[in-house]
Amino acid sequence: MNRGWLFILVAIAGLGAGVLSHRYAPVSAEAVPSTDDALAVKFDDLEGKSRALSEWRGKVLVVNFWATWCPPCLKEIPAFVDLQRRLGPEGVQFVGVALDGREEVAAFVRDHAVNYPVLAGEEDVARYMQQMGNTIGALPFTLVFDTQGKVRHVHQGEWTGPEAEAVLKPLLSRASSHAN
């Protein structure tokens, strides 16, 4: 077998192991850094402007890490677009953080009518995901912050609309009861 095929087989096996291992190694919300550290990170938006996650503090913030080459990532985005449309007025804010270059991401966002902010980066995004508990670099990876900026939920792997809504609704209820 030539070296090219061997490399491809090893890469596929590694990817498969990563996908399987994220199902059995969940990250707990308690395992992530403190609120200020978690929200202080900055990534570039699609116009190249640096934006901090703290910009959305005060909302139930869903930060979804994805890539244009990741099939499970692409599968969950339409559900997130729907949830942003329905729950945005109630105080939910989705922010996508792509592990890709801005040009590729901008084309995808435009073609798929993504209705929430999308940021992009490469090594900086991978480092942040690792700091937030995603030690194997599995995608998609999603963090949910409450209105106070505390991580309340961490999800590795594809997240369906109903699963996400089941996490978000109680956080919205808690936020509205604290506001009264």
Where are these regions (language model features)?
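Short pre-active-site segment immediately N-terminal to redox-active cysteine/selenocysteine motifs
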Residues: K59-L61, F65-W69, G101, A138
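Conserved hydrophobic/aromatic "anchor" residues
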Residues: V41, F65-W66, F108, Y116
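Structural microenvironment flanking redox-active thiols in thiol-disulfide oxidoreductases
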Residues: L74-A113, E123-M129
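N-terminal targeting signals for export/organelle localization
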Residues: M1-D44, A179-N180
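Active-site acidic short loop of glycosyltransferases
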Residues: R57-K59, P89, N115
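Thiol/disulfide oxidoreductase modules built on the thioredoxin-like
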Residues: R110-V114, E122-K169
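A short beta-strand-turn-helix
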Residues: A40-L61
